[in-house]
UniProtKB/Swiss-Prot annotation:
<dbReference type="GO" id="GO:0001522">
    <property type="term" value="P:pseudouridine synthesis"/>
</dbReference>
<keyword id="KW-0698">rRNA processing</keyword>
<dbReference type="GO" id="GO:0006364">
    <property type="term" value="P:rRNA processing"/>
</dbReference>
<dbReference type="InterPro" id="IPR007264">
    <property type="entry name" value="H/ACA_rnp_Nop10"/>
</dbReference>
<dbReference type="Pfam" id="PF04135">
    <property type="entry name" value="Nop10p"/>
</dbReference>
<dbReference type="GO" id="GO:1990904">
    <property type="term" value="C:ribonucleoprotein complex"/>
</dbReference>
<dbReference type="InterPro" id="IPR036756">
    <property type="entry name" value="H/ACA_rnp_Nop10_sf"/>
</dbReference>
<protein>
    <recommendedName>
        <fullName>Ribosome biogenesis protein Nop10</fullName>
    </recommendedName>
</protein>
<dbReference type="InterPro" id="IPR023532">
    <property type="entry name" value="Nop10_arc-typ"/>
</dbReference>
<dbReference type="GO" id="GO:0030515">
    <property type="term" value="F:snoRNA binding"/>
</dbReference>
<keyword id="KW-0687">Ribonucleoprotein</keyword>
<keyword id="KW-0690">Ribosome biogenesis</keyword>
<comment type="function">
    <text>Involved in ribosome biogenesis; more specifically in 18S rRNA pseudouridylation and in cleavage of pre-rRNA.</text>
</comment>
<comment type="similarity">
    <text>Belongs to the NOP10 family.</text>
</comment>
Length: 66
């Protein structure tokens, strides 16, 4: 099983350990991006969520709702 490099959320150090940072004891995260899929089965939902968040933060986009 290949090991993945992990980064500490607290101090930013990189490690191969899986549970806690050996330097500060903080939580670890995988710093790699998610895999890309051309089919993108959840793209429709992600775009809908982005549109709703944008509308709540800045109002509806120009040209919509007029």
């Amino acid at each position: 099983m290949p090991k993945r490099l992990r980064r500490c959320k607290e101090c930013g150090e990189y490690t191969l350990q899986r549970d806690k940072c050996p330097h500060c004891g903080g939580d670890l995260e995988v710093p790699h991006p998610h895999r890309f899929s051309p089919e993108d089965p959840y793209g429709k939902y992600r775009r809908k969520l982005k549109k709703r968040v944008w509308a709540e933060k800045f109002g509806p986009p120009s040209g919509e709702g007029d």
